[in-house]
């Protein structure tokens, strides 16, 4: 009431009315600016004058019970006067000091769990190694980098659902936790953060840091993985760099690195199979990286690398619209072109059909070690401004740009025939033929290109055909710059199509990616990559193929057994036996296959001759196209450990060893699994013994003593005769074979002879 009365008095004075009504609008705008809205317009000033007051802070009334009125020095901590317009207490900054020193403590157990990203960063920095500082020109280029080490790589939407479920489980709203990683994280975090006293909003912020990849477009010269980016301000300036080795790795960097290796291996393997696209999809769907399905990672991970993008395209995911050539990422920044097929003659008079791009275009080219700006017209390079770490890197970029320009002098510089092939032995397309040729022989290209005198332009110098710098002359149209070219910043993704040979096209039909662009660099993955697909067994060499093939048969034995007896042709054609063929000497494949298939056919024909161990052992050999021959084998050769090793048709060997007592199979000393033989197998009636390695001579002959059981039979020496009890209590005379090789004929004649002997 007091205030209102005061205002009325003021308004009654003519001066007040005049100020308020006649003040110009621009002043009014200023008044408005500082008085409207809740946002503080000059926080620094406000802080200064607030802190100059005795009691700048307001607090809940309960504070009067929790804090004494005066501290040990006798200074007043809070005032008895209420805060105007609320029922809060006015408090001195000294009260905060008192609270920090003497206030109640809470459990700190949750701090490392909630602030885990900070604690981990401190550890990485503690164990990191900072090296010397070097002063030199820094060629930095802006790249899209991950600034958040240690995240789980969920999408924002997925993370939002996890955070709501963990921090605000009782809030209303539909939450869909579908992916494996979402469910695991939710479970772990709920457990970790039980009874957490930290403000929920803070928990939510910190969880977001743990779950979501955050990227920024930053100038970088050097490592781009997130553990380097978090110390970017310490490791590179405008004219200096400091060497640094991170004191720990984070899973998201490891996932990115392992994903690239897995994708490269899969694309390389798919290229050589009969149906590359189908094979690639089969492998992507059956591969795990660090225990997570590769397809889940591909859906979430924004890594842009040629092989990764081919896998994404195959899965129908959008990818970046830039295209790849010669290991450089090209992005058209202006101009346009139309395609036209044209035939050109090389220096060796070989005809090449190339797709010529007609029209003026400008591109940025970004590679790992060099970047460039390229301006070109129809079959003509107008200008190339390139920057790179060293001569070699610059040369790589120059070769790629020269080939890409499709200039005649480049095509005429070809010496010799172009017949490069890919992994599947198919000829490369003409542009890649040219690229491969000049990557091997750039000298002729550079010498044929021509040179020109140059003007003195700041920050640019010339480069001669031998790749040395010069201020007077340069390769025609080519200049070297101190400044790098930024990577394309947009994160825009476009719909693409892919054909069965893994060529990826944009919507206008231009090929933007193909297996030829996939790097041949081999690396060692940081996380375990588990390729369940048989196509990837070869990746770890012949031994792995051998072990994996037998493990696969044992794992699927129930189905294999039925197919073996009912639809053997289907079984022999299974793709799981494909890798095995590369271990069998080429000349012997068909003969082995014919031999094993015949043996199997007899096992099917003659009751009681089924032998689990032998079928498993010989099955992979039956997959090759069979040759009909009368060849007999007592052992089959496989090429492992750098030489031929033998698998015995009957009995154990270092390659294939079945232990009857433990019922386990070891292949090359590695456990391949447990075998369940059919009940009664091995004692199933004497035929199984008779038919392999014994010749039936006729009816029982008393001179050779009482009838032996099947187990006693195995003690016979070669050439020895004995009476044997078979099948339904009949006795026949047999002789143990002198040679191992005639196993096959045994089983053919045995059936007839048993019948004759019995009848």
From Swiss-Prot:
SUPFAM superfamilies: PB2 C-terminal domain-like. Keywords: Cap snatching, Eukaryotic host gene expression shutoff by virus, Eukaryotic host transcription shutoff by virus, Host gene expression shutoff by virus, Host nucleus, Host-virus interaction, Inhibition of host RNA polymerase II by virus, mRNA capping, mRNA processing, Viral transcription, Virion. It is found in: Virion; Host nucleus. GO terms for cellular component: host cell nucleus; virion component. A motif (Nuclear localization signal) lies at residues 736-739. The keyword Lipoprotein does not apply. One of its GO terms (molecular function) is RNA-directed RNA polymerase activity. It holds the Pfam family Flu_PB2_7th. InterPro entries: Flu_PB2_2nd, Flu_PB2_6th, Flu_PB2_C, Flu_PB2_CAP-bd, Flu_PB2_middle, Flu_PB2_N, INV_PB2, PB2_helical. Belongs to the influenza viruses PB2 family. Influenza RNA polymerase is composed of three subunits: PB1, PB2 and PA. Interacts (via N-terminus) with PB1 (via C-terminus). Interacts with nucleoprotein NP (via N-terminus). This is Polymerase basic protein 2. It comes from Influenza A virus (strain A/Fowl plague virus/Rostock/8/1934 H7N1). The gene is PB2.
């Amino acid at each position: 009431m007091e205030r209102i009365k005061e205002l009325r008095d003021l308004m009654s004075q003519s001066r007040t009315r005049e100020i308020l009504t006649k003040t110009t609008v621009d002043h009014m705008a200023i008044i408005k600016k500082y008085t409207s809205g809740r946002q503080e317009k000059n926080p620094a000033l406000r802080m200064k004058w607030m802190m100059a007051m005795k009691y700048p802070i307001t607090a809940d009334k309960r504070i009067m019970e929790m804090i004494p009125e005066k501290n040990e020095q006798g200074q007043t901590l809070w005032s008895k006067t209420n805060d105007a317009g609320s029922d809060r207490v006015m408090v001195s900054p000294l009260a905060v000091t008192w609270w920090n020193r003497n206030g109640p403590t809470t459990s700190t157990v949750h701090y490392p769990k909630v602030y885990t990203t900070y604690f981990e960063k401190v550890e990485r920095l503690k164990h990191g190694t900072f090296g010397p500082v070097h002063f030199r020109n820094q060629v930095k280029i802006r790249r899209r980098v991950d600034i958040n080490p240690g995240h789980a790589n969920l999408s924002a939407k997925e993370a939002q659902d996890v955070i709501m479920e963990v921090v605000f489980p009782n809030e209303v709203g539909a939450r869909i936790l579908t992916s494996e990683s979402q469910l695991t994280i939710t479970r772990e975090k709920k457990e970790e953060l039980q009874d957490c006293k930290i403000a929920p909003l803070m928990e939510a912020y910190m969880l977001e840091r743990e779950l979501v990849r955050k990227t920024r477009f930053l100038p970088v010269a050097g490592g781009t993985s997130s553990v380097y980016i978090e110390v970017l301000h310490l490791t590179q300036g405008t004219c200096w760099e400091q060497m640094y080795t991170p004191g720990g790795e984070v899973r998201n960097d490891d996932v990115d690195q392992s994903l690239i290796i897995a994708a490269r291996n899969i694309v390389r393997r798919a290229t050589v199979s009969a149906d590359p696209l189908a094979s690639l999809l089969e492998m992507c769907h059956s591969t795990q990286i660090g225990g997570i399905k590769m397809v889940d990672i591909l859906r979430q991970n924004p890594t842009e690398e040629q092989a990764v993008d081919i896998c994404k395209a195959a899965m129908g995911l959008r990818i970046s619209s830039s295209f790849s050539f010669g290991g450089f990422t090209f992005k058209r920044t202006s101009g346009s072109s139309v395609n036209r097929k044209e035939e050109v003659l090389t220096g060796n008079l070989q005809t090449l059909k190339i797709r010529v791009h007609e029209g003026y275009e400008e591109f940025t080219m970004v590679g790992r070690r060099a970047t460039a700006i390229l301006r070109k017209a129809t079959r003509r390079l107008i200008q190339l401004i390139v920057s790179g770490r060293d001569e070699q890197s610059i040369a790589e970029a120059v070769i790629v740009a020269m080939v890409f320009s499709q200039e005649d002098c480049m095509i005429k510089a070809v010496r010799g025939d172009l017949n490069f092939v890919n992994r599947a032995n198919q000829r490369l397309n003409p542009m890649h033929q040219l690229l491969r040729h000049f990557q091997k022989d750039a000298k002729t290209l550079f010498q044929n290109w021509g040179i020109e005198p140059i003007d003195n332009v700041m920050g640019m110098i010339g480069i001669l055909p031998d790749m040395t710098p010069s201020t007077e002359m340069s390769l025609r149209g080519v200049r070297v710059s101190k400044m790098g070219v930024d990577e394309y910043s947009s994160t825009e993704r476009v719909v693409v199509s892919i054909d069965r040979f893994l060529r990826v096209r944009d919507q206008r039909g231009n090929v933007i990616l193909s297996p030829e662009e996939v790097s041949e660099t081999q690396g060692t993955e940081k996380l375990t990559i588990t390729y369940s697909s048989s196509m990837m067994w070869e990746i770890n060499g012949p031994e792995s193929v051998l072990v994996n093939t037998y493990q696969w048969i044992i794992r699927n034995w129930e189905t294999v057994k039925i197919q073996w007896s009912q639809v053997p042709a289907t079984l022999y054609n299974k793709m799981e036996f494909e890798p095995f063929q590369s271990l069998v000497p080429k000349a012997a494949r068909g003969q082995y296959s014919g031999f094993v298939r015949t043996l199997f056919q007899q096992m099917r024909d003659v009751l009681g001759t089924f032998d689990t161990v032998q079928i498993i052992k010989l099955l992979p050999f039956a997959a090759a196209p069979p040759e009909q021959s009368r060849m007999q084998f007592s052992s089959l050769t496989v090429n492992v450990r750098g030489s031929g090793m033998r698998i015995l048709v009957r009995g154990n060997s270092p390659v294939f060893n079945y232990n009857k007592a433990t019922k386990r199979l070891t292949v090359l000393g590695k456990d391949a699994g447990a075998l369940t033989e059919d009940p009664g197998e091995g004692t199933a009636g004497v035929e199984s013994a008779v038919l392999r390695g014994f010749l039936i001579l006729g009816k029982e002959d008393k001179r050779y003593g009482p009838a032996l059981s099947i187990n006693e039979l195995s003690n016979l020496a070669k050439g020895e005769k004995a009476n044997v009890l078979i099948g339904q209590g009949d006795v026949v005379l047999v002789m143990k074979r002198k040679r191992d090789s005639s196993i096959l004929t045994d089983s053919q004649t045995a059936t007839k002879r048993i019948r004759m002997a019995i009848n």
